[in-house]
Amino acid sequence: VIFQRTVLSGLVAELPPEVWTSDEVERRLAPLYGRLKLPEGRLELMTGIRERRFWPQAIRPSAASALAGRRAMQAAGVGPADVDLLIHSSVCRDRLEPSTAAYVHGLLGLGPQAQILDVSNACLGFLNAVALAAGMVESGQIRRALVCSGEDGRPLVERTIRLLNEDLALTRETIKPYFANLTIGAGGAAAVVSRDDLAGPGAIRLLGGAAETDSSANGLCEGDTSFAELDMRTDSEALLAAGVALAQRCWGRFKGVTGWDESTPHRVVTHQVGRRHSSLLFEKLGLDPAKDYQSFDRLGNVGSVSVPATLALGIAEGRIKPGERVALLGIGSGLASMMLAVECQ
């Protein structure tokens, strides 16, 4: 798809205040590490994740989403009556019914004119929501949308630590499906999607994008809730191989739609999984690793928040500059990939 007149404004990353280093996670896993004689430092060594962030107390996804949404509206100069569509796009949600967007709407005090819905597609949700909102902007159905996401990985990480320490039947082999859980973090992200003539200076222009799906891999990473607790198991090796193969196919489609090639983007922002994933992805796509802007070393994997938060941080830190073109390479379990071409202004 090609976008003619749609931009992102007020893009923000909402970072929780509590920092958990990978060393701290391993200290909490001392019973497991001692029993299986696991070497200390392996978590950071294998992933490149030095730390991740959590909120210090339980927080509903709607509250995290609204924290980011409020800041995005302020940054974009948008009031409650200006939002025609609100999308909550994270993996985490308050409950099955009603939509988490209903709670975000109330927390932000949006007007009755705003449509609400949740878009859920694992770690790809935010990019999916942006593309859907952009399509509605381009067609004239809406003028502005607010896309929000709020992820809280703390319950998953804490449950995983407890399970790994308490289940004495686990071995070095059988702990592998739980390893990816220890890379998860928390955070929020939000942006206003609108027509370009309604946005102020500094907006990010959406140029186009492409998507690709491989549902044969839908069993490689599965998460669920059980009695208010989160559970996730991942075949990390198979997921890495299938994910990179899917990304290669999507990259080919993306280049055909946008007219870009490997030399076009000044910067590349991918879903933030870890060092090995990024290295293999850049190798297989033929991209220059020097163009990679990462946040996983300090944020871990923050689900749907990872790509928008990383883009927001790159801009805020001056690592992504006005006039530069950026390839946003998203992927989520399922497997699904979406890649968007944007230009910072």
Describe each PLM feature range.
Residues A122-L124, G150-R154, T160-I161, G188-A189, ...:
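Short acidic/polar capping segments at secondary-structure boundaries
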Residues W20, E97-T100, A131, L156-I161, ...:
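Short acidic, glycine/serine/threonine-rich loops at helix termini
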Residues S62, A66-G69, C92-D94, G106, ...:
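Claisen-condensing/thiolase-fold acyl-transfer catalytic domains that form or cleave C-C bonds
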Residues L36-E44, R95-L110, L156-L170, G219-T225, ...:
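Acidic-glycine-rich active-site phosphate/pyrophosphate-binding loop
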Residues V1-A58, L168-A241, R249, I331, ...:
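Condensing-enzyme catalytic core mediating Claisen C-C bond formation in acyl metabolism
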Residues S9-V12, S89, S120, A145-E151, ...:
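Short beta-strand segments
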Residues Q141-I161, D214-N218, R275:
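Acyl-CoA/ACP chain-elongation machinery
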Residues A81-S89, D261-H271:
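Short glycine-rich phosphate-binding loop at a beta-alpha junction
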